[in-house]
A protein has these predicted regions:
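NAD(P)H-binding glycine-rich loop region in Rossmannoid oxidoreductase-like domains
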Residues: 41-72
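NAD(P)-dependent short-chain dehydrogenase/reductase
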Residues: 104-108, 112, 116-171, 200-201
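A recurrent short beta-strand within the Rossmann-like NAD(P)-dependent oxidoreductase core
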Residues: 129-130, 151-157, 169, 176-189, ...
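N-terminal Rossmann NAD(P)H-binding glycine-rich loop of SDR-like oxidoreductase domains
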Residues: 3-23
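C-terminal "lid/loop" region of Rossmann-like NAD(P)-dependent oxidoreductases
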Residues: 181-185, 192-199, 203-223
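Amphipathic terminal alpha-helices
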Residues: 224, 236-250
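Conserved Rossmann-fold NAD(P)-dependent oxidoreductase catalytic core, especially the SDR/UDP-sugar
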Residues: 52, 78-108, 123
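Adenosine-cofactor binding site in Rossmann-like domains, unifying the SAM/SAH pocket
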Residues: 26-42
């Protein structure tokens, strides 16, 4: 298969790229790190799938730069949706669990608009909080593993491992288009308070801060649609953290 990945050098994109190359698929990369801007995107007509993951994803930064988030998350995605629709190419694009509280931030608004402008058959992937090797240094799970966290919050977060995310994407790609929903929550369906993971599971003694008003207090996914397809997550965040942080406390 010929698969285009935007954001192919990013966290999820790089994992997908390596998995699919190993399976013998032809991967077309489109990434700013390769000098390719989304506004200039060219999608070949013989492409089987476009996996659109390139986006600005920092909720806090979106408060400070709303116009930039509109340009990078809305204008570019709307264009990709149009091109894929006109060429008959199946599109899966990164939405976010933020759509459930979309009015709290420009980032959430941008993802809500992405879902509203999608054409029939195009699928939004409402990722919760993805973790694993290669995640941004600012992400909490990585900080806990590296013993770099200075505080925890009272947020409830649905942490999903990147390998489980990839399994969901592949499962949906293998479904007939007429059987797909417009969007799917992509998480484990299990929420954990961040301070519980940090202090009770990892054994730290971090101060606890209140969550910011522009962030959802709880992003636990409703994975009923995924479970209806017999999918269940394979990696549990509590087990993952216990394994990764045990050495820190020996």
């Amino acid at each position: 298969m010929k698969i285009m990945i935007t954001g192919s050098s990013g966290f999820v994109g790089s994992h997908l790229k390596e998995r699919w190359k190993a399976k013998g698929h032809q991967i077309v990369e489109w990434d700013r790190k390769e000098g390719k801007e989304l506004k200039d995107i060219v999608i070949d007509g013989d492409t089987n799938y476009v996996i659109h993951l390139a986006a600005w994803a920092d909720v806090r930064a979106s408060i400070e730069r709303p116009n930039d988030y509109w340009e990078n998350n809305v204008v570019t995605t709307t264009n990709i949706q149009r091109i894929c629709h006109e060429k008959g190419i199946q599109l899966f694009y990164a939405s976010s669990s933020c759509v459930h509280a979309w009015s709290k931030s420009p980032y959430g608004i941008s993802k809500k608009v992405n879902e509203e402008t999608a054409f029939p058959g195009q699928v939004g992937l409402r990722f919760t909080t993805v973790y694993g090797e290669g995640a941004r240094d600012t992400m909490m799970i990585g900080k806990l593993v590296r013993n770099e966290a200075n505080y925890a919050t009272n947020h409830v977060r649905d942490f999903i491992h990147v390998s489980d995310v990839m399994d969901v994407i592949e499962m949906l790609m293998n479904k007939p288009v007429h059987m797909l929903e417009p969007a799917y929550d992509v998480g484990t369906g299990i929420g954990n308070r961040v301070d519980y993971l940090a202090n009770d599971i990892c054994g730290y003694d971090l101060p606890v801060k209140e969550g910011q008003s522009y962030e959802a207090l709880d992003n636990t996914a409703d994975i009923t649609l995924l479970r209806d397809m017999k999918w269940e997550p394979k990696v549990n965040i509590v087990d993952y953290l216990r394994e990764k942080t045990t050495v820190l406390h020996q």
